[in-house]
Structures are given as C-alpha cells and as structure tokens.
Amino acid sequence: MTTFPPKLPAPKEFSALNRPEQLEVLRRANARQKLRLLVEAAAGEELLALLPPQDVYLLARELGPDQIPELLTMASPEQWTAFFDFDCWDGDTLGRLSARKWLAILLQGEAPWVAKTLQELDFELLVLMVLREVQVVSGPEEMADEDVMAENRRRECGYVLDYRDEDGAKLFGGLIDVLFRYAPEFCRYLLEAVRSEGESLLEESVYQQRGGRLLDQGLPEPYAAQTVYAWLDPESFVVSGESKRPLGASAIGVAPGAALQLASPRGVLAEVLGAGVDGQTAWELTCLLNKVMMAEKIDLGDLDAVRGLGERSYALLNLALEYLAGSNATAAARCLQTAYAEQLFRLGHSLTLRLQRRARAVREAAVGAYLDGPYRQLTDALLQRPPQFAEVLVRPERGGRRLFASLREVRLTEEWLDRLEAQCRLFEEHFPFPLPSVDDWALAGCHPGHGRELTLSAIFLTALANRLLERPFAPQPLAAGELSVLHALVSRGGNVNPELRAQTLSWLASLEPGGSAFGAFCLDLWEEEFCKVRTAELDPRYVGGLIVRLAAAL
C-alpha cells in the first residue's frame, strides 16, 4: 500500500525485507530516500531494474542525472531507452544535445556494461542518435590498400568516419570504440545501418515506436489525451459496482509511485491516500497524471510543471470525492476503489466546467461589460484554463485566484453565480431601459466619463436616484447640484435610509427571485461612498455609485 507521507525503514531493516516488501518501500520513498536505499542495498541493481522506467527517470531529474551516475549505470536497457523517450524529443524531432547529455552519462559506466546496454537499447533509436552525429565516409570494402584497411579495422571498425564537431567526436568516438572492443560485429552492423538509413524516414519510424512505448507507460499522444477533459454530467454520474480492468502495465509491472509523490493531496483525498492505496490504484493515478501531462504538452522532465499539474489533478479528484462522499473518508476510499481515477477526474473537472459555462454566458450577455469588481473577479477566475476559484469570495480584500480546494468553494461560487444571473435577468427582463454598448453612452462632461468605466451598481443607483428625484427610472446623469438634494433623501445618520432600503429590496425581490441581493450590494456601496460623506464635502468627481454631469460641463 502506498501511503502519504511515506514512513520508511532504516537501511538494515530494508535489507531484511522480502522482494515485494522492498519494492513497496521504494514505491513510497522520495527521490533521496530511494537513492540511498538502492545504493546501499546488496541487490540494488536488481531492485532498480524492477522499478517503472518513469520512476527512475523522475528520480534522475529531481536529483540531477549527472549527479547520480553510480545509480544510472545500474539502470536496465529498457530504462535507458525510456530516458531518451522521455527527455530527448521536441515534438516529433529527436533533440541532438539532450541525447548527448544522456549518452555521456551512460558512457561513464564500465565498458562491458556500456557495450551490453547499447546493444539492448532500441536499435533504431541508437541508429538515429549516431546518424545525427556521425557520417560514414567509406567502409572497409572501399579501401584498396591492405595496410590502410588493416589499420582502420583496428579502429572504428574499419570505417572512415566524420563527426559533426569536436565534442561529438569525443562522445561518439568513445561509443564506437567501446562497441568495437566488446561487440565488434554489432558495431559494424550499427555503422552499416547508419550508412544506409535515410534520416527523415528513420526519425518518423523511431517517433512512432516511441509513441507505443510511452502508451505502455500510460502516456498517450497529446491529441488522444484530450479525452481526459471530456464533459461528464455530474447530475447523472453513478459509481459502478463492477470490477475495474487493470490499466496499461498494471497487470504485470511493479506499481509506480514517483509521480504521485511530487504533489500533495488535500481534503478527503489526502485522508484516503494517507491510509494507503493498492498497486492498481497507484497505476490508475499515475496513468491519469500522465494523461493530463500529455494533454497539456508538458515536458515530463519539467518537475515544477509536473508538480503543478499534479496539484491540479489532485484538487479535481478531491472535488469529485467530496461531491460523491462528502467528508466521509471511508466512503471516498470506496469510490476510488470502484470508479476509475480518470472518471473521477472528469467529474471534478466537469463541476468546475459547469461554473465556467455559466460565467461565460454572463460575460457574453449585455451585462457582461458592466460587472462590478467582485463579480468581474469571479468571472475572470472562472474563465481561466482551468477554471479557478476567486479569493474575493472569501476574502474581500484579496483579488487572487487559485485552484478549487473543496466542494464548499464550488457551492459558494454557485451562490455567487446565482446572484449574478439574477442581476442579468433584472437588466434584461425587468428594468425599463436597455443596456447600450460601452461606446454608445453619451457621457461627455460626466463622471465617469466613458461607458467602459460604468458598473451595474452605478447604472442601477443612478436610475434609482432619478426615481427618487421624481423622474423616470433610467440611468440619466444627475446634475452636480442635485447631489445635496439626493443625499438628504437617501442618508440617515451616515447610513442608507432604512425605509428606502426595505422598499428597494422588496421591490427588486418582487421583480426577480434573488434580486434583493443585488439591491443590498448596491445600497451598501451607496452607504460607504455617498451616505457617509457630509453634504458640504460632496465632490461630484469622487462620488461613487452615481453618474454625475459635472458643473463645469453645464
């Protein structure tokens, strides 16, 4: 069982464990713990070879591959092929310099091990790496002089080679030398392949084979990975009681743990993972994280990006579990055991996507250009990719946004959207004036001076002010000289007249269920920015919640 955070035995205790127990400990260990256990273990090389290639790769990336040659020179050929698969491609192009970096580390091993590992790498991948760096000028059959032929057979397998540059000559000359000394027939076979292959077709073939190997690790093509974001209706989601089918290598391989350790779960998910998960669930979670990384086209070696996507994936899983099981960790664990992790991820994502769709509909409506500050922050956060929680909902003094941490935040956001949609209906269906576009307001000589500076609260309060001044309910600018008259009608002891507040809220509630919340929001603004200002100190340039025509423009 994988637990978070890991509790590991001392090295002596680790050596006394049987093989499955040792592998389970390694699965739970962080990078430095894993390195220490593997290096000190008597069967470290055997244990390392059993670990999933991605776990070994992430360990190397976290600690620095050039810092742990003693470990990487124990890695299996399958793991080495994975290092090149994970770290040496830019789209469908093999990166020459990144391949050099890994080959340089490989060549630090003992020569017999290097030769054996090179022979067991994916052959076409090895040919492509050499082809990028080495030109075979001629082979043994082209040498007429027997003395020259004999000399060349003693070095570089009898071939005349040109290298891309001096550094490449040192690296690939060393590679060919090792192969010639310990596997001469393979060396000749490799150079003949380099001599005969076309680079473009070979690279395409290697790229396709790489895709198959990545898929075995739960890493699909980026286009196919987009299905991880497919909509799943929360209202109709049901956890199936049927047995789950093992994913990818989970049926035969050692379960991974490195990717799961990079991020920290929260909420009920943290309780579930803290109690431990079995190998099948560890595979599912890793495959899910991998699919999200591929969908986002994240470099698998960019640990900060991987960690960020891990936090995001855990956050959405937590939303799904809270939606299905509340805070009951036992029920949540049952959901994780009976529903695929990807289904739960899609459920959590859909809970936030549903909020985003509502926010987008409001922003595309006529009111969208005039949202007041908190509501604009709300919709701005929801329109991010992925949808995010606006902190102004819980801390009015803050304006940040972050991932949704709990279902409570989803529910709070829904409540704010309910209020925002009520505002939309008030303006679109009930108020007796249309909302023009921001460029169609005639505000020359007014404060605010342009439609883009207006908010729904200012538009409503200006219309209400006109009504109190016995004019039609419409957002026509007030004359600066009318502010003192309005102040006397609205203010009582620095607060909004309680009778006016009650009447206004009752009227809005009669027009639209939930409309009174908008009225309360607007009157609170009036109370702070208008009522608390003494009449003698009213300055039309600084009065909030009203459209005022300045005296100088009259």
Regions found by a protein language model. Name each.
Residues 1-74, 78-554:
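General marker for long, soluble alpha-helical cores
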